[in-house]
Amino acid sequence: MNRIQILSESASVGMRLRDILYQDGFSDITLADLTALQDIPQNAVTIIYAKSNISALMQNLSDCGGSIILLLNPDCYAMQLDRARHMGITLLLMPVAPYMLLDAVRNAIS
């Protein structure tokens, strides 16, 4: 099973995302804040939750590899949809339903 890295601007959201994945059987999960953005491994599925400075985040993600799932609040989602699609990033709307998160992770792994 692939490694999963969660980078979150909110510790409580990051822990909730990790719990959803653990409950579904995923085990190789690391949790960090957004400062770990420079260390995204090529072979990991990276889940990122951000609520501020989205433009700079998208600029940084353009150089990253691997599978990226980006979770955004409604006020940012629509503005970044086309850009994320062009960059090959899966974009999900917060609050994300557990089944949607799990489907996105499974699709990124396969």
Q: Across the structure, where does each feature detected by a protein language model lie?
A:
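The C-terminal output helix
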Residues: 106-110
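Two-component/phosphorelay signaling modules centered on CheY-like receiver
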Residues: 11-32
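Alpha4 helix (beta4-alpha4-beta5 surface) of REC/receiver domains from two-component response regulators
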Residues: 74-91
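Conserved acidic carboxylate
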Residues: 7-8
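Acidic, metal-coordinating helix/loop segments flanking the phosphotransfer/catalytic sites
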Residues: 31-45, 52
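Short amphipathic alpha-helix used as the core "switch/output" element in two-component signaling
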Residues: 55-64
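Short beta-strand elements of ligand-binding domains
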Residues: 48-50, 67-74
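C-terminal output helix
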Residues: 96-105
